[in-house]
Curated annotation (Swiss-Prot):
One of the primary rRNA binding proteins, it binds directly to 16S rRNA where it nucleates assembly of the head domain of the 30S subunit. It comes from Hydrastis canadensis. Keywords: Chloroplast, Plastid, Ribonucleoprotein, Ribosomal protein, RNA-binding, rRNA-binding. It is found in: Plastid, Chloroplast. One of its GO terms (molecular function) is structural constituent of ribosome. This is Small ribosomal subunit protein uS7c. GO terms for biological process: translation. The gene is rps7. Its main location: plastid. GO terms for cellular component: chloroplast; small ribosomal subunit. Pfam families: Ribosomal_S7. Belongs to the universal ribosomal protein uS7 family. Part of the 30S ribosomal subunit. Gene3D superfamilies: Ribosomal protein S7 domain (1.10.455.10).
Amino acid sequence: MSRRGTAEEKTAKSDPIYRNRLVNMLVNRILKHGKKSLAYQIIYRALKKIQQKTETNPLSVLRQAICGVTPDIAVKARRVGGSTHQVPIEIGSTQGKALAIRWLLWASRKRPGRNMAFKLSSELVDAAKGSGDAIRKKEETHRMAEANRAFAHFR
């Protein structure tokens, strides 16, 4: 048994312009090689493009996209008796949001296009509408969990 206490859960800080935690989570996830100012630039340009495309609040589009992509359940590999099973597990809200952001960035990097801001804005708008690769990834994860429902007792 560990003598150390449990780690306190850190609350995500909000970004300077929109004062939103989701934007900050997105910035920290898009960050490469410590270039945070470039990450902020990319996110803010993407949000500006969303504003121009949809003529609505870009934060509501971002929130809608993340809620649409957030999975309720995922599969985890668990070794039982010499064979590995994909065991479905429920996901908490924080972990679900983190997965959703990761999938949105993965899908936007895969997209053809001029720059990351353009690709990210397109993916966010598509995800808010209920289409796009990130939504497909969520549905695929849910299908995997449904297919392996028989192994749920291995939790």
